[in-house]
Amino acid sequence: MAKKIMVIDDDPIIVKYLVTLFSDNGYETCSASDGVQALEAVKTARPDLITLDLEMPQEWGPRFYRKLSKDAELKKIPVIVISGLAGQHAVKDAVAFIRKPFDLDKLLGIVKKTIG
């Protein structure tokens, strides 16, 4: 069974780009466009990994991450932060912080190292 990656980003172009990248490399994908929608989607989809943008409408990335971290099961899901902001300290337990614009090979390497 393919590993599932959830892409959380408010930019539909980035979402499409990452969903295509991950799908083309054998991963199942799902997405959410803001932190409020994402929390419910994570509970339902139970992804193996999350990519998270920091700056989103309604609820920004670090706040979503704090809520995720309060759930005993959900906090086990590895998170890769992909953001144009220089706020890697805002999600200190993330597997990696990748600054936009990002290198696809680097991102894919981190994903493969993290979930196979």
Label every PLM stretch briefly:
Residues 8-9, 32, 50:
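Conserved sequence signature across two-component system core domains
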